[in-house]
Amino acid sequence: NFINFHLKDSKVLDLFSGIGSFGLECISRGSKFVFFLENYPPVLEILKINISNLKYETKSKVIDIDAFKINNNTFKDDQKFQIIFCDPPYKEKKIELLIKNIIEMNILEENGIIIIHRKKGDLDIYPKKFKVIDTKNYGLSTFVFGRKI
C-alpha cells in the first residue's frame, strides 16, 4: 500500500533487477516508465523475455550494467526517479556506497523514495544524507524505505 501511493505516473529505477518482478509490477500498477539494471547474462535474457511477453517495451529500458558502476553517464542529464528499488545480493556489503552514489548523482526526485531489500537482521550502515522513514519485515526479508535529506 505504501508503494501504491507513489506509483501513479512514476519513473522507477530497478537496481539488481533480476527477472524484473518489482519493476514489472510497478508498470502494471501505473508507473510511467521503469529502467531495469541487471548484468547477469542468463537472468538478463529472462528479464527481456518477461518484458516482451507483457508488451512493456515502450514503458521500460534494460541496461546491462553492474548497479555499483552506475555514474552520471548511465542516464540522461536530467533523468530523475520517484522510486529507486535496490535488491542487491544478500551477501553484498557495499550498500552505504551505493546509496551515497545515488544521492550524489542527484537522480532521486525531491520527494522520491529509495527502497532497499535486505536479509532480515542485516545491519547496514547508511550515508548521513539518507534518512530511514520505515522498515517492513516479510519472512526472511526486510524492506528499508528512505529519503535523501
Language-model segments: which ranges?
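Class I S-adenosyl-L-methionine-dependent methyltransferase catalytic core
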Residues: 1-149
